[in-house]
Amino acid sequence: TKMKKILLQTEVTKMLADTFTPVGIYLRLRDRFRDTILLESTDSHAAENSYSFIGVNAIGGIEISSLNEIEFKYPKQEPQKELIQKVQDAPDRIWAYMQQFEMQPSTQKEAIFAQGLYGYATYDAIPFFDTIEFKPGASVIPLMRYRLYQYVIAFNHFKDELYICEN
């Protein structure tokens, strides 16, 4: 059965960032909102790609804690767990998940900052993408974890601007 697309519309507010730091805002938000993350830029002097991001309040996502199970999270729904038959199928399942979201076009190019998944894949997630096999072991963190956030705060360090993007 084909699932109905989940429509997302992103609103963007631009502010001067000269009195804010990504770490300062993150520290104020992390205990108030679940799943808050900070991805900080290392180069604040380069004009391109000099951004830091704070994701606040996950509304969807994917989590893989073992080589045989994947969990999908959708806005306002209970998480859904599914078995992974072959580890090489996981990237296609992640792609299929992402295709279930339809982003409404925005007049502000910065809306794209909130219209994707933020997360990570650990070293132990290599079997999902290659033929390498590892000895099974207990992982203390998920092998892969990606989230769609209700709010993404994007800092443009080069221009001293911040964008509050809301889905």
Residue ranges of model-derived segments:
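Signature of the chorismate-utilizing enzyme
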Residues: 2-167
